């Protein structure tokens, strides 16, 4: 199957926007699930962080006005998302998700990603969560989800 759209900055930004929309849509459900086993703030924290990430991307993309730089690369979008999540999402989720996006941003200076590149960045993200959380498959963590 071929992609109709390139896996570039526009794609990576749309991916973050889609994730933010999904989190917003399921915020209350995520919070209720967390309340059953924790402090009940996961949905709220994650929603706040994802909205902040989208706002950061919007401000950076608007201000660059075609000037080039890291926001011409999917890795720049992923790194900006990582740093925003690290700064805005509390609890264990902030460091775990921030690390996931930071590791994914190691994809490098590729303006357009292949499907193999996307698979690699997702594997890097999972590896980051595993290392940061000291988790193994089967430990009933987000790696198992």
Where does each model-flagged region fall?
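N-terminal loops that bind phosphate or other acidic moieties
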Residues: 1-145
């Amino acid at each position: 199957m071929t992609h109709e759209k390139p896996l570039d900055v526009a794609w990576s930004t749309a991916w973050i926007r889609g994730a933010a929309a999904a989190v917003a849509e399921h915020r209350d459900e995520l919070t209720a699930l967390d309340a059953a086993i924790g402090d009940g703030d996961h949905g709220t924290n994650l929603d706040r962080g994802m909205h902040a990430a989208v706002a950061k991307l919007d401000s950076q993309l608007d201000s660059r006005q075609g000037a080039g730089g890291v926001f011409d690369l999917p890795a720049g979008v992923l790194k900006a998302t990582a740093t925003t999540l690290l700064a805005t999402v509390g609890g264990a989720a902030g460091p775990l998700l921030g690390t996931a996006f930071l590791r994914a941003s190691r994809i490098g200076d590729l303006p357009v990603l292949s499907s193999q590149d996307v698979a690699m960045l997702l594997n890097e993200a999972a590896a980051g969560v595993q290392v940061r959380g000291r988790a193994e498959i089967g430990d009933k963590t987000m790696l198992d989800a």
